[in-house]
């Protein structure tokens, strides 16, 4: 009897040890699998949040070993994270393609692809003042009313913000009314304008100071959506794609000023904007999005695969109200994996 008890006890001890070893082995395998998962970091413009969320889910489904992590922000802020703060990203997607050659090349990038278009519209809600009166011909007059508050993103951080300034300066030329930009922005901020022989240079100070009774400003354009819908201000200058994605009402602006059409490039270039903090001058031009894999990207192979995935699924952009450029136009040392999907320009 005693011998049987001893044998049973030994068997129980051995069984417990074996189970423990198996559990540790399983935990070890799970930890190993978790460690092997690649984190693909993407810095992208806020206006790309909706389509890139779709791309993230689609890409992860096809690549279960990859975890896509997105950091939306103003495009200038995205670039600054890389070139000023030393942060590493696998992909940079900007709402203004020119930021890549102007701010990143050649040290932080050696190629880029132009893959989507957009235009600026004036969005509003049922809470906006004079919503039943405003239209595509009187919008600039409605905005000048003293009880109307307008919103735009910070031109120091976000292309949508500096494009808004360009649109309003172009509006003065289009409507032949030199008071529009003055009354809407210049009188209510420390932004200045210099005029020289029919061309205009908008000067944006390092620290933007605005009259909050008239202007509502946040870092990136998508930060303004919730306040607009809550009635914190009345009208928002924003990309048409974002307005469509969030089911906002909006006024379409004339093609001559909305920065959406190549055929008006010569008109747009009458206006430029200088970001004093970076000593960068940006010419008004048609809105084109750009994407690159930074030279110090931790996971270049997977990053190029993601760019290839985006270029191969333009319908995601189109379905979200953002016209895709087909084929995409690429510049620089374009990776071999992308060459069949792009038109390479010198």
Curated annotation (Swiss-Prot):
<keyword id="KW-0813">Transport</keyword>
<feature type="binding site">
    <location>
        <begin position="158"/>
        <end position="160"/>
    </location>
    <ligand>
        <name>molybdate</name>
    </ligand>
</feature>
<dbReference type="GO" id="GO:0005886">
    <property type="term" value="C:plasma membrane"/>
</dbReference>
<comment type="subunit">
    <text>The complex is composed of two ATP-binding proteins (WtpC), two transmembrane proteins (WtpB) and a solute-binding protein (WtpA).</text>
</comment>
<keyword id="KW-0500">Molybdenum</keyword>
<feature type="binding site">
    <location>
        <position position="239"/>
    </location>
    <ligand>
        <name>molybdate</name>
    </ligand>
</feature>
<keyword id="KW-1003">Cell membrane</keyword>
<dbReference type="InterPro" id="IPR022498">
    <property type="entry name" value="ABC_trnspt_W-bd_WtpA"/>
</dbReference>
<comment type="function">
    <text>Part of the ABC transporter complex WtpABC involved in molybdate/tungstate import. Binds tungstate and molybdate.</text>
</comment>
<feature type="binding site">
    <location>
        <position position="239"/>
    </location>
    <ligand>
        <name>tungstate</name>
    </ligand>
</feature>
<feature type="binding site">
    <location>
        <begin position="158"/>
        <end position="160"/>
    </location>
    <ligand>
        <name>tungstate</name>
    </ligand>
</feature>
<comment type="similarity">
    <text>Belongs to the bacterial solute-binding protein 1 family. WtpA subfamily.</text>
</comment>
<dbReference type="GO" id="GO:0015689">
    <property type="term" value="P:molybdate ion transport"/>
</dbReference>
<dbReference type="GO" id="GO:1901359">
    <property type="term" value="F:tungstate binding"/>
</dbReference>
<dbReference type="GO" id="GO:0046872">
    <property type="term" value="F:metal ion binding"/>
</dbReference>
<feature type="binding site">
    <location>
        <begin position="46"/>
        <end position="47"/>
    </location>
    <ligand>
        <name>tungstate</name>
    </ligand>
</feature>
<dbReference type="GO" id="GO:0030973">
    <property type="term" value="F:molybdate ion binding"/>
</dbReference>
<feature type="binding site">
    <location>
        <begin position="46"/>
        <end position="47"/>
    </location>
    <ligand>
        <name>molybdate</name>
    </ligand>
</feature>
<dbReference type="Pfam" id="PF13531">
    <property type="entry name" value="SBP_bac_11"/>
</dbReference>
<dbReference type="InterPro" id="IPR050682">
    <property type="entry name" value="ModA/WtpA"/>
</dbReference>
<feature type="signal peptide">
    <location>
        <begin position="1"/>
        <end position="19"/>
    </location>
</feature>
<keyword id="KW-0732">Signal</keyword>
<feature type="binding site">
    <location>
        <position position="221"/>
    </location>
    <ligand>
        <name>molybdate</name>
    </ligand>
</feature>
<feature type="binding site">
    <location>
        <position position="75"/>
    </location>
    <ligand>
        <name>molybdate</name>
    </ligand>
</feature>
<keyword id="KW-0479">Metal-binding</keyword>
<feature type="binding site">
    <location>
        <position position="221"/>
    </location>
    <ligand>
        <name>tungstate</name>
    </ligand>
</feature>
<keyword id="KW-0472">Membrane</keyword>
<feature type="binding site">
    <location>
        <position position="75"/>
    </location>
    <ligand>
        <name>tungstate</name>
    </ligand>
</feature>
<protein>
    <recommendedName>
        <fullName>Molybdate/tungstate-binding protein WtpA</fullName>
    </recommendedName>
</protein>
